[in-house]
Structures are given as C-alpha cells and as structure tokens.
From Swiss-Prot:
Catalytic activity, reaction form: L-homoserine + ATP = O-phospho-L-homoserine + ADP + H(+)
Protein name: Homoserine kinase
Family matches, as Pfam families: APH
Keyword Oxidoreductase tagged: no
Enzyme class: transferase
Keywords per UniProt: Amino-acid biosynthesis, ATP-binding, Kinase, Nucleotide-binding, Threonine biosynthesis, Transferase
Domain of life: Bacteria
E.C. number: 2.7.1.39
Gene3D superfamilies assigned to the protein according to its UniProt record, in alphabetical order: 3.90.1200.10, Phosphorylase Kinase, domain 1
Keyword Phosphoprotein tagged: no
Pathway where this protein functions: Amino-acid biosynthesis; L-threonine biosynthesis; L-threonine from L-aspartate: step 4/5
NCBIfam families: PRK05231.1 (NF003558), thrB_alt (TIGR00938)
Signal peptide: none
Length: 332
C-alpha cells in the first residue's frame, strides 16, 4: 500500500539475512493504498511482496498470516507467507511487524465484465466455506464498534446533510446488528476488502472455454470474522457498480451473486437483509475514507481515496436495491 516507513538498502540487506530467498535483484515501494507499507521484492528465487504493518500489532498479525496459509491449503489462491530462519511468519522491521509473502500471477481488472464477476463470486464462496474450520478468531476491526468510535471525530468536517446521513445510518445499522435476524446470519472469516485492485486475473489456458482465469485474492490485512453476507456486499459494491454514480450494474451483480450461490446458497435471513448489508458495506468504506481524508497520517506516497464515492453508493443503496437472485443455476 502507501509507503509510511522507508526501507533503505542496508535495512533490506539486514532483513533478508533471516530468509533463504537468494540475492535481491529489485525492490520498490507500492504507492497505492493507505494502510500499510508495501514493497515489490524480486530475488534470484522469485517475486515477493514485503509488507510493514503500520497499525496491526504483533498480537493481531498471526490471525491474518495463518488465515492465508489455511486458505491456501484448501485450494484458495492467496499469497503464501514465507517463514523466516526461525520458523516465524513475521519479524520486526524498524520496530514494526513485517512479513514477506509470495507474489501472485496476473493483473488487476479495473473494468470487470460478467466473466470476471462470475470468477470472483465462485471463489469468494469457496473462501467462506474453506474458512469454516479455521481455528483463530479476530473480529472485523472496521465494524460497528469502530464506526461508533470514529464518526464523532469526522462530523466536525462534513456538511449538515452528510452529518445527518452519517448519524442516521449509524443508528439504522446499530438496530440491524442488534436484531435476531442479524445474529442468525452465517459467519466466519471474511476478506472484508475484496475490491477490484485486490484480485488478480491471468489469461486462461487454451481449451478451457474461458477467456480469463482468476489468479488470486490478496491484501487480507482487513480480514476478520464477520457475516459472510457483509463480505458479499462489500464485493458487489465495488465489482458491480457504475463508478460515476454508484448505481448497481444489475447484470454484473446478478452474475456474481448467482455464481456465489452455485457454491453456497443464501439463507432466508440473508435474503431479507440484503439491502441492509449493502448499506453496511457502503457505510463502512464511507466512514473510513472520510477519516483518512480529514485525519490523514504522514506517508511518502499517500493517495487518499475519494470519500464521495461511497457516499453516493450509500445513498443509492438506501434508495434502490434489487433482491438477491432466487435461482441457483450454475453460471459457467
């Protein structure tokens, strides 16, 4: 993501002594994103990503790294953390937790079509089912308690109309989260940030009947245990929208949701609260983007996202949300 912590050549040389990855050939910061310091790392053994965790603690980090290993062992394409010479999956770099993971093949698809959405929907459902027997627990750290804590810090910066929406939606979500239906929603480990730039695609092999192949999901450092429907809503709110207006692209949304259902059908409570969860997914990112925009941290290559994008999506979801598709017809 953005580079908050710089790494010199001597820093890197010292760090790499703890890994058996060969000689360093190339190393550069990744400017996108706003949470961690990420670097592309190429050695004589392969291509990797070095991440310095700016907020996550050493106590929290095993949930994320072990989750990636667990998912990989269940056939979900994710980055694989590389053990150090002492067997640990992370160490300290400039006093902060840091890890090296394998770099996935492919490139992000920032203008996805139907086939991309089908691939994402099916793999997201596989991820959810694969996580059912994951032993560690970590709540989604950007859920209702975080909203309650940080909305008061944001409201002095926004318009009266935005404040009304922020506070009104917070009350709506608090009531939803307290309901019996919410408690009945299926849950488990979730990615919680499965945007277009966190998924890679490669060209499919000849003769498969597909034009694209899912290369993998990455950036699991917002992951947490949450309702699976929240993860689906976050994904649909990014993969299946008109970026200018926030309006759902019904064809893409239908493709992604039907594909998901071929692996894990939605429950009756999930169907009743699809609109509420789409609103929750939009609200989570509107609040975090407002916070990062008005209360930023210093960084060498910080590029804050536009908060207005998710405000438009939230207003659109409040006004108009189609129901989940009823059929479970396979999409491929």
């Amino acid at each position: 993501m953005a580079v908050f912590t710089a790494v010199s050549d001597s820093d890197l040389a010292q760090w790499m002594r703890h890994y058996e990855l060969g000689d360093v050939l190339a190393f550069r910061g990744i400017p996108s994103g706003i949470e961690n310091s990420n670097f592309f790392l190429t050695t004589t053994r392969g291509e990797y990503v070095l991440t310095i965790f700016e907020k996550l603690t050493a106590e929290q980090l095993p949930f994320y790294l072990d989750l990636m290993r667990h998912l990989a062992s269940h056939g979900v394409p994710v980055p694989d953390p590389i053990p150090r010479d002492d067997g640990a999956l992370f160490g300290l770099l400039h006093g902060k937790p840091a890890a090296i993971v394998t770099k996935l093949d492919g490139a992000a698809e920032l203008a996805p079509g139907i086939e991309h959405c089908i691939e994402v929907g099916q793999m997201l459902a596989r991820l959810h089912l694969a996580g059912r027997d994951y032993a560690r627990y970590q709540p989604n750290l950007r859920s209702l308690p975080w909203w309650r804590e940080n909305v008061p810090a944001i409201v002095p910066f926004v318009s009266d109309a935005q404040r009304t929406l922020l506070e009104g939606e917070l009350a709506h979500q608090a009531a939803f989260f307290a309901s019996d239906d919410y408690a009945a929603l299926p849950s488990g480990p979730c990615h919680c940030d499965l945007f277009r730039d966190n998924v890679l695609f490669a060209h499919a092999a000849p003769g498969t009947g597909h034009d694209v192949r899912l290369g993998g999901f990455f950036d699991f450092y917002f992951a947490g245990c949450d309702k699976w429907l929240f993860d689906v809503a976050v994904t649909v709110n990014d993969w299946c929208v008109d970026l200018a207006t926030g309006v759902l692209d019904v064809a893409r949304a239908d493709a992604l949701l039907r594909a998901y259902q071929t692996v894990r059908p939605f429950t009756a409570p999930e169907r009743r609260h699809w609109s509420d969860m789409l609103r929750a997914g939009a609200y989570r990112f509107w609040v975090s983007r407002l916070y990062d925009f008005y209360l930023p941290r210093a960084a060498e290559m910080l590029k804050p996202h536009d908060p207005g994008h998710f405000e438009r999506i939230l207003r659109e979801r409040i006004a108009n949300t189609p129901a989940l598709p009823e059929t479970h017809t396979a999409c491929n």
